[in-house]
Structure formats: C-alpha cells, structure tokens
Amino acid sequence: EQRAAERMEALVNDPDPTALPQFLTAVPKGGDLHMHLSGAIYAETYMEWARAETLAGTTKYCINNSSLALATSCSSGVSPVPSPGDALFDQVVRAWSMKDFVPGAETGHDHFFATFGKYGAISGSAHHDDCLADVMERAESENQIYLEPMLFSNSTASSKGSDVWQGGTLTTAALPGFHA
C-alpha cells in the first residue's frame, strides 16, 4: 500500500503532464455492467453515420431545428446533419449527450433521459454491429476488461418484461439475437 501511494504521489508530481494519464490508461478498469449499447455511442459517431447514410442515399437524415433531434422526415424546419466545425454540430453534441451540461431549467436527470429520443432515428437501425465494435474498441483502448451490453431497444425489453410480468413465458425464440 505504501509503495502504491508513493508511486501515485510521484505521478501526480511528475513534470511530464502525460505521465499520470498514461499510467491511468494502463490500469485495468474492471467492467461496465448493464450498459445500454445505444447510449454508449458518442453523439459524434451517430452524426457521422447519419451523414454517411444520407450521402449514400440509404436514408435521408436531417436535424430538427427546434428539438435538435435526428429526423428522417426532412421538410421545413430542418437542417442537414452537421459536420465537425459547424456551429450546429456542437449544439447537437450537447443536446445528444451530457457534454457541457449545466443544470438550470432542465435537471441532469431530465437532460440525460431526453437524449435517447434525439438520436433514436439511427440508434435502432442497422448499426448494432457498428455500435458493438465501437464500444469494444473504446473499452480495449481504456484497458477495460469486461462489458455487459444491453442489446434490446427499450420498447423490446419493456414489452418482453411486461409479458412475463403478466404471466407469460419468455423463450429464446422470442429474443432476437439470443444464442443459447
């Protein structure tokens, strides 16, 4: 314990500002339990996917100017999905995440839970594999050794839970993507 305290003290006082972050990155982190996969993806990544799909003509995405939510109904009151460096880009990142959040009229709780609906147009799409790969790569770079991702959308999970609660049964056939 004494050696660990001395090592930490030396890192904190090291004149090299990268010493402590490098050490902390190398430390094994344990696990991330009950991680909702859609909420573990950065807003910037969702916007990158939306821009790419729009450019490819797969799905046309836009940003609702008043709610800052991602939309596929792109008529009036919308803007193209912004790119990094655009003023709207930073606004959308703050709306879709806790970045720079300051409590005020909206609580942290309310802001956090409101974010999911803002990027829902793409998070429930065909990007589950991309989401899982993104989270696994980030975990590896942070030396995190265990992930427990939740792969169901809230509606799927709550409908299955409701069925069981009301006396129904749950089988592996009812669980998309479940491998016995």
Can you name each region flagged by the protein language model?
Residues E1-A180:
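Metal-cofactor-binding active-site regions of metalloenzymes
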